[in-house]
Amino acid sequence: MRAVLLAGAVFLSLSYPFAAVPAERSNPAGNPPIEILAPAEGAAVPPGKVLVIGRVKPGTASGVEIDVNGAVHQKAIASNGGFMASVYLTRGRNVLSVHADGMRVERRVVASETVTYRYHPEAEKCAGCHAEVSRGYVVSGRKDTVCYQCHDRKDGKKLVHGPLGGGDCTTCHDPHGAMNPSLTVASAEGLCVMCHDQPSSGKHLRESRAVGCITCHEPHSSGKEYLQK
């Protein structure tokens, strides 16, 4: 009888399995609920204290956990769409992982004396560019107006480059940090072909690796056609 009861218990446990604990999922493509804005993937940053800046879709989570190489290093409040926290990296390869609401996003960086990633000088002072937190970290005014609080104006000539004329410096520049000089989101030539045809499709007087788009063209504004220098 005892053997029969035991067999029945095993049968019932197999017939009615317990609810599985959902595993963490990686961010979906498109409009991810969690996003790391800085540092960039593959960036080389100084060893030690590193600032992690990110965005969380409003209503997703009230806080995030930031792991470094699998160990929890920091917890941060995710208030109205943004979070910021400092973690400590050891020399060599490091994996940053941000968790919230069952979702996970990772970023691989290298802590090295040879630095390739540059933060915006105001990165740790969100309020310098963003409105108060209760408004969801929106930019406090037109984007270029915020930039001109510190930077010289670049639109003073007759012809103004399209993104700058539209007041959006962030088409070409990352306001948090980047691996390129002047915090551009790509190399100088890479930026141009994001919108323009490849140079090989037009008539250029000279072909040389030493000559790039900005050798002849102004990226902001110019008094000559085609934004020539």
Across the structure, where does each feature detected by a protein language model lie?
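Inter-heme linker and motif-flanking segments adjacent to c-type heme-binding CXXCH motifs
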Residues: R104-V110, T114-H120, A127-K229
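Aromatic/hydrophobic beta-strand junction motif of beta-rich domains
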Residues: L51-P58
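Short beta-strand segments within Ig-like beta-sandwich modules, predominantly Fibronectin type-III
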Residues: H73-G81
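Conserved structural position at the C-terminal beta-strand
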Residues: V98-A100
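Surface-exposed, short loops/turns at beta-strand junctions within beta-sandwich domains
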Residues: S86-R93
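Short, compositionally biased P/S/T/A/G/V-rich stretches that sit at domain boundaries
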Residues: A20-V45
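Bacterial N-terminal signal peptides
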Residues: A7-Y16
